[in-house]
Amino acid sequence: IHLVLLLLAFTLVAWIAARYDRPAARNLLGHYFDSPLPAVIQSVVLVYRPPLLDILPLYILLVAITPLVMAAARRTGWPSVLAVSAVVWLAAQFGLRSALHGALHLPIALNLMGSFDLFAWQLLWVGGLWFGTSGLPMLQSRPERLRGLLHAAAMLAALMLAYRHLAGPHGWMDSATRQFWLDKWSLSPLRILNIAAITGTLMLVGPAIASRLRALLRPFEILGRASLWVFTAHLASLLLLLCVVGSDDRLLDGAAGLAAAAAGFAAVFVASAL
């Protein structure tokens, strides 16, 4: 799937960007326009990861390490695996990725290797593996403790939602502090806390909502079951949309914006039905 998206980007999207002067698409593929052959080779081996095309490589790499994680969990237990994952995540918060890039002298700029920090995001993946295989059954075996944790998670989620909308995107912080606590690319501490709080909230209220709104939620259930294909269709739609947008700062509004949104939604629902 990733190779198909790369093919779309490096052929049709690149041709339209060059032929019809589409800066948004050209800037997305800047490294490819500067060095076509190295960019193609580097992208195939998941080193060069242009914006929008840097999420599937992350997914591929995390899937690749899953057998190793599961084997380590069976051999040493989940506590040690989670501890190692947490230490790697903590090191990522203090620049592990950039330090390794400098030490290895890689022939590609760090900003061309994708926005998402693998060393940070692996914690979410490993945590999900633990939760699905061991964590959730363990919590369900202790319903009193689980109930208390879920109510605490719901309160925390409400507080963080209020903080986000009262403090705004800057969060009452200077840029350096905000980078450490709220950065999305390195899955910063408050991001981890927020994900845990939302997960607990959904566990608390999700079953009741699903039972009452099952018919309304059915389309989203279908999207979730075909999430990989839905995401692929979404990315392809975005790449093609960049061929329509004339510049980075031009917004589609009015009829053009509605048409683009309708086409995007249609693409993901068609993909989920295939």
Task: Give the predicted meaning of each segment.
Residues 1-274:
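Alpha-helical transmembrane segments and their immediate juxtamembrane cytosolic regions
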